[in-house]
Amino acid sequence: MKTPSQTHVLGLAHPPLPMVRLAFIGLGNRGVLTLQRYLQIEGVEIKALCEIREGNLVKAQKILREAGYPQPDGYTGPDGWKRMCERDDIDLVFICTDWLTHTPMAVYSMEHGKHVAIEVPAAMTVEECWKLVDTAEKTRQHCMMLENCCYDPFALTTLNMAQQGVFGEITHVEGAYIHDLRSIYFADESKGGFHNHWGKKYSIEHTGNPYPTHGLGPVCQILNIHRGDRMNYLVSLSSLQAGMTEYARKNFGADSPEARQKYLLGDMNTTLIQTVKGKSIMIQYNVVTPRPYSRLHTVCGTKGFAQKYPVPSIALEPDAGSPLEGKALEEIMERYKHPFTATFGTEAHRRNLPNEMNYVMDCRLIYCLRNGLPLDMDVYDAAEWSCITELSEQSVLNGSIPVEIPDFTRGAWKKCHISRTSDLY
């Protein structure tokens, strides 16, 4: 609930941090990869690690020692993360745990004077989204969701093109998370599966789109959401569930507990969103169908079109009936290459790092903190993109009725016209 003295944090900036002191909560598959990435980033110091499974903590500490870094303090147990957040020598806490613990950990961290970087989605309910917003506004701490797809080179190029008016007026965008994860959902943690199978458990209990941010984040940036426009309402529809059951029958037998289990989450979810200014957004989610990976990333405007999947495609007036190919496509991608790609992305290639968009995201986050700049993604992005999880489920369960999307800025979106991720300064 908003207090009388509480104001928005659009454009929030803090004094520069010469050295950014980091702590990590969660050292499973994603957490360890994040930790290893930050060994490549200048201007950071890893102060503390927290992991509920002590074996994972020991392995993570060993990674740092073998890389020539001082061993950070370790915390474990159910409340270890709280003790770590209560320290006064940490600037930024990374939260790389299961979905359901993201918000309480972020809120506690901000209440103890820490900036937070949260794995996606940042929250699972609208109530949790409001908790993040209210806490960030009251504490004046940064709260960034680690939506790495916003730093994809093609996404950044189309963002740059949109900001320069190349597509004309944007009328419609599309995003998705289509990724066959059946083997991971059923795998033990030792074989790359989720801790305690939390991903599969969510599929049993919920429907809608539980993971909207990979597709939604980049296209919301193109539409300048909460910086001159905002998402108004959505309608959502899910197909029947068949993929999980079919996979379980094939791999565990028709009479296995896995095959007999009932799953509420439909195989394909499609959510349509309209903005206050009349722009339309389509977001899809499917992780149980044998098909190629896709995030779609479609941009439609009055002067042109772009789409990343299944193959990168750009078409512009006056010859928009045919997409640019070969050298012509390369030239337009080079002409509108985003500054982040030109600097941090080039550095990632030079150093032969495995995931360019992660590296660009990491570098940009630390760059902003060390230079006292607003972050590229704020708490309102985290709330707006994450709230689709609960709201899409509400729509699906009620015959695809329209569901209103809250204005987490409480009207400040009308006053703010900041062009995000357009400069390095």
UniProtKB/Swiss-Prot annotation:
Co-factor remark: Binds 1 NAD(+) per subunit. The NAD(+) cannot dissociate.
Q: Which protein family is it in?
A: Belongs to the Gfo/Idh/MocA family. Glycosyl hydrolase 109 subfamily.
Q: Which PANTHER family match?
A: BCDNA.GH03377 (PTHR43818), GLYCOSYL HYDROLASE FAMILY 109 PROTEIN (PTHR43818:SF1)
> Has keyword NAD?
yes
Q: Which residues bind NAD(+)?
A: 29-30, 51, 99-102, 119-120, 148, 194-198, 211
- What is this protein's function per UniProt? Glycosidase that has specific alpha-N-acetylgalactosaminidase activity.
Give the UniProt keywords, A-Z.
Glycosidase, Hydrolase, NAD
Q: State the EC number(s).
A: 3.2.1.49
Please write the reaction equations for the catalytic activity of this protein. Cleavage of non-reducing alpha-(1->3)-N-acetylgalactosamine residues from human blood group A and AB mucin glycoproteins, Forssman hapten and blood group A lacto series glycolipids
GO molecular function of the protein, one example?
Answer: nucleotide binding
* InterPro entries to which the protein is assigned, alphabetical: Gfo/Idh/MocA-like_OxRdtase_N, Gfo/Idh/MocA_oxidrdct_glycsds, Glyco_hydro_109_C, NAD(P)-bd_dom_sf
Name of this protein = Alpha-N-acetylgalactosaminidase
Per UniProt, substrate binds at Y177, Y211, P212, T213, H214, Y293
User: What does this protein need as cofactor?
Assistant: NAD(+)
Its source organism is Bacteroides fragilis (strain ATCC 25285 / DSM 2151 / CCUG 4856 / JCM 11019 / LMG 10263 / NCTC 9343 / Onslow / VPI 2553 / EN-2)
